From Swiss-Prot:
It comes from Caenorhabditis elegans. CDD domains: cupin_HGO_N. It catalyses: homogentisate + O2 = 4-maleylacetoacetate + H(+). Its cofactor is Fe cation. Its EC number is 1.13.11.5. GO terms for biological process: L-phenylalanine catabolic process; tyrosine catabolic process. Fe cation binds at H336, E342, H372. The keyword Oxidoreductase applies. InterPro entries: HgmA_C (IPR046451), HgmA_N (IPR046452), Homogentis_dOase (IPR005708), RmlC-like_jellyroll (IPR014710), RmlC_Cupin_sf (IPR011051). Disruption phenotype: RNAi-mediated knockdown together with fah-1 RNAi rescues the impaired growth and fertility defects in the single fah-1 RNAi mutant. This is Homogentisate 1,2-dioxygenase. Gene3D superfamilies: Jelly Rolls. It comes from the Eukaryota. Plays a role in the tyrosine degradation pathway.
Length: 437
């Protein structure tokens, strides 16, 4: 059993937390942020997640009390090898409106592949320079990052492990993230990923905004992802005087710098700009108890809003186990043409509308206004099913990244692992129309 299996967490979404490593319980200053001399010879450093003048209800920042300030490092140099399958530049990619489905992305075939070594971009839209957009990536690895940390200057990472637990060390402390859990690492926070074996998963990256809980409207004060179930790390530090590599994703490109100490030297911190995790199995599902199929927005876990009210740069939506009991209703998802782009992934089990070709570790993209919906077998079965109450999606967990932006498929993903027969899922659908007599 690893130390990570025994971790304790701070609870609550967006809370104003305060924590010190138990080895130095008085690390935080009392009544101020930046004393003339911090206790134990620590340095005070603020990490800003929003503009200073953002409304107080939206303002995000944390104060870190660390052994050395982050500014102690040698100059950054470009890392060309990391740009091979990664991009945040979608403007030059040819458009492609077809339905796409990818088979499970392969695990590494050679040893020593870390999280940061094997990140590859599937699709995305927007722009990191103007800081409005998103990108969807996959990762696969089989080795831990040793004396290496990374951070994203462009935006937030929402990490969805599909196979293998991730032991994530951050400046704020440590997180154990298992499949069917997610982690969010906000912009600028340094972190390192250790694994226990072959691991893979998905990443939703957003720039120019942060994830927040969706409004509940008429649902009321409770439901969906409850704030109390989000977990942030307690302070933990290491005082290591060894060479570390700091990897920085900046304007969609990769850079690295060397420094002579661990970046995970924060002895205490307070604030509301933090990394966090969430167990998807704790999601409280809302569904119809009368008739018709509810829109998938009722399954939203987190949203990254755009400047247009009610419209997201990205929503993170899940389809967890639940009861289906709608009367006189076609219960699977309906046929749809959407003004949003929909990327789907599968963590475990099978997806209710496509039980055959959609496998854990794979994905699908239905671009803006591209038709999609249940395959032939699903339609035939659901149209003739006995409409008794039954469990839906039992033993499965699928998810969707939905965006108001057009998404371009990268040149790499157009050809890699593609299910070229995906369109055939709908070809057997029959004409059932009969004219009235």
């Amino acid at each position: 059993m690893s130390e990570f299996d025994e971790l304790k967490y701070l609870t609550g979404f967006g809370n104003e937390h305060a924590t010190s490593d138990p080895r130095v319980p008085d690390a935080l200053p009392v009544g101020q942020n930046s004393p003339q001399k911090c206790s134990h010879g620590l340095y005070a450093e603020q990490l800003s997640g929003t503009a200073f003048t953002a409304p107080r209800s939206q303002n995000q920042r944390s104060w870190l009390y660390r052994i050395r300030p982050s500014v102690i490092h040698r100059p950054f140099e470009a890392m060309k090898e990391n740009d091979q399958h990664w991009t945040n530049n979608f403007s030059s990619i040819p458009p492609n409106p077809n339905q796409y489905r990818w088979n499970p992305f392969p695990l590494p075939t050679k040893e020593g592949v870390t999280f940061v070594d094997n990140l590859y971009t599937v699709c995305g839209g927007g722009d990191v320079i103007s800081r409005t957009g998103l990108a969807i990536h996959q990762f696969s690895c089989n080795a831990s990052m040793e004396h290496t940390a990374m951070y994203n200057s462009d935006g937030d990472f929402l990490i969805v492990p599909q196979q293998g637990a991730l032991e994530i060390t951050t400046e704020f402390g440590r997180l154990l993230v298992n499949p069917q859990e997610i982690a969010v690492i906000p912009q600028g926070i340094r972190f390192s990923v250790a694994v226990r074996g072959p691991s893979r998963g998905y990443i939703l990256e957003v720039y120019g905004t942060h994830f927040q809980l969706p409004d509940l409207g008429p649902i009321g004060a409770n439901g969906l992802a409850n704030p109390r179930d989000f977990e942030a790390p307690v302070a933990w530090f290491e005082d290591l005087d060894v060479e570390f590599t700091i990897i920085n994703k900046y304007q969609g490109s990769w850079f690295q710098a060397k420094q002579g100490h661990s970046p995970f030297d924060v002895v205490g911190w307070h604030g509301n700009y933090v990394p966090y995790k969430y167990d998807l199995k704790k999601f409280m599902v809302i569904n119809t108890v009368s008739f018709d199929h509810c829109d998938p927005s009722i399954f939203t876990v987190l949203t990254a809003p755009s400047v247009k009210h009610g419209t997201a740069i990205a929503d993170f939506v899940i389809f967890p186990p639940r009861w289906g009991c709608a009367d006189n209703t076609f219960r699977p998802p309906y046929y749809h043409r959407n003004c949003m782009s929909e990327y789907m992934g599968l963590i475990t089990g099978c997806y209710e509308a496509k039980e055959g070709g959609f496998k854990p570790g794979g994905g699908s993209l239905h671009s803006m206004m591209t038709p999609h919906g249940p395959d032939f077998n699903c339609f035939e079965m659901a149209s003739n099913a006995d409409l008794k109450p039954q469990r839906v999606a039992e033993g499965t967990m699928s998810f969707m990244f939905e965006s108001s932006l057009n998404m371009a498929i990268t040149n790499w993903a157009v050809y890699q692992n593609v299910d070229k027969d995906y369109y055939k899922d709908w070809q057997p659908l029959k004409k059932h129309f009969t004219m009235p007599k």
